[in-house]
Amino acid sequence: MARPYMIFAVLTAWFFGCNAQFGFFDQMFGGGGGGGQQQQQPQNVRSDSVWYQQQYEAAQCSHYLCPGTLSCVHFPHHCPCAWEGVEEKIELGEGIAICASKGGWAEGEFAKKVELARKGML
């Protein structure tokens, strides 16, 4: 008569062991594993341009609206760099401005490199 109890005990231990193991994998691989306690993940920014177009169209500017920063300036070459902390801006003679990573160069080094490139020496 002890056999049915033994089989029941073995099956119960096996069931709870499997359940604990799969709960571990669910939690490890982002399945939640919390028994219904799922955390709300923030949504990524959409990959299409609709959001940007809405922001651009809603911006109030009576002069020139910079496409990269949505800043309102008097002339296109006055547009600021999007990441002023890590980018350096130079204005070219044709009313065009460009921004590039400072890259650890000394102050003004980017402008020198652009000038050399414009002369064909770089």
UniProtKB/Swiss-Prot annotation:
Keyword Nucleotidyltransferase: no
InterPro entries: LCL2 (IPR034543)
Biological-process GO terms, alphabetical: ERAD pathway
Disulphide bridges: none
Keyword Signal: yes
Record's signal peptide: 1-20
Keywords in alphabetical order: Signal
PANTHER family: LONG CHRONOLOGICAL LIFESPAN PROTEIN 2 (PTHR38425:SF1)
Name of the protein this chain belongs to: Long chronological lifespan protein 2
Gene: LCL2
